[in-house]
Structure formats: structure tokens, C-alpha cells
Amino acid sequence: MSNDDAVLLDLNVPTFQKKLFELDAGEVKKVFKTFQKLQMLTWNEVFRDHGLKWEQVKNEPGTFTIRLSKSYRAVVERDSAFMLFQTLHLDHDGAYGKK
């Protein structure tokens, strides 16, 4: 595993899929544009990208949040080259378990 590896997306967690499929068409378009962007990046590029806002979740090692659109953040984990999408949140605080 290297930070120079291309990012691979794993969108197969049922709780993530449920929220993703509930999005309206406009929001789906924005989120999928971010998925397309992520597939073109290496891990180092993800860490440096200011628009994605990759952040560690406090007190949860190995768990991070990433901005998918202006409205939505996802909670993700990294497994080798894979970014595993766990949950999707409308609000910033929800992604950090604060609500």
C-alpha cells in the first residue's frame, strides 16, 4: 500500500447505499462528479485536495470524513488502495457523530 496508488472506491456498504439512493437527482449528479474525481486521484492527491476536506474523525482511528458536495459528507475508511464508504451525512456534525 502506497500513497502513490490510485484511489479505488468501494460503495457497497448497505447503509451508505440506502442514503445515496435517497438523494435527489441534482445532489446525485454532484456526488457522482466527486466519485469521478476521486477515481482519477492518488491517495496523496486526496490528502492535499482542499475541496475534498479529508479529515480524521476524532477518537476514531482509521475513520475519516470527505466532502462529496457542498451539502454532503461521507464517513470513510481506507483499506489498502480502497476508500470504503460507510455512511453519508447531510450535515457536517452528523458525519462526526455530534448530533
Annotate each predicted stretch with a short phrase.
Residues 3, 7-14, 33, 42-44, ...:
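Alpha-helical context
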Residues 31, 35, 46, 50-53, ...:
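Residue-level detector of alpha-helical recognition elements and their boundaries
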